[in-house]
């Protein structure tokens, strides 16, 4: 298990964060991203996932993450 930090960004400002989330691998981050995205109502927000080293491994717009989380939206 590795620890990952989840952050919601509005511009360059972090408006919400959930640090040190244990995940078995980076693919396990997507359900968490979808859950966070469903709660975001501000336009233009992004969700960033960082490794404990500080390296960004996922950066996605909240709207895109919401669409990804909706199984009725075809790719």
Residue spans of the language-model regions?
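Short aromatic-glycine-(Arg/Gly/Cys) micro-motifs in beta-strand/loop hairpins
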Residues: 1-17
């Amino acid at each position: 298990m590795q620890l990952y930090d989840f952050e919601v960004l509005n511009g360059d400002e972090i408006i919400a964060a959930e640090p040190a989330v244990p995940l078995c691998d980076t693919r396990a981050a997507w359900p968490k991203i979808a859950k966070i995205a469903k709660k975001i109502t501000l336009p233009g927000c992004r969700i960033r996932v960082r490794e404990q080293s500080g390296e960004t491994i996922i950066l996605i717009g909240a709207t895109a993450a919401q669409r990804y989380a909706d199984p009725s939206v075809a790719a």
